[in-house]
Amino acid sequence: MRGMGNMQGMMKQMQKMQKEMAKAQADLEAQEFTGTAGGGMVTVKATGKRVITDVVINEEVVDPEDIEMLQDLVLAATNDVLKQIEDTTSQTMGKFTQGLNIPGM
């Protein structure tokens, strides 16, 4: 019967961890991230849900003769903000799986 108490304790611990993970995920999703490129000439903002909320382009980088450069800057700023979200998510959620030997995590 000792094993049942252990199992109940483990289940409670898992439920607590699930609640903490859900809160951490909600906090991440509500957070706003900012990516930049060209020394701040292009800024892209996104939520933790990876929804782009704002793009700011400094007029100095708008050259009708070189649209490709502007496209590259927007792409770089977007990739920067997405990487920040990914890194923050991995760091935050990694705390929950640290020490667990779960395949695929």
Swiss-Prot record:
Its main location: cytoplasm. It comes from the Bacteria. Keywords: Cytoplasm, DNA-binding. GO terms for cellular component: bacterial nucleoid; cytosol. Residues 1-16 have a biased composition (Low complexity). SUPFAM superfamilies: YbaB-like. It is found in: Cytoplasm, Nucleoid. Residues 1-23 are annotated as: Disordered. Pfam families: YbaB_DNA_bd (PF02575). Belongs to the YbaB/EbfC family. Homodimer. PANTHER family: NUCLEOID-ASSOCIATED PROTEIN YBAB. This is Nucleoid-associated protein lmo2703. It comes from Listeria monocytogenes serovar 1/2a (strain ATCC BAA-679 / EGD-e).
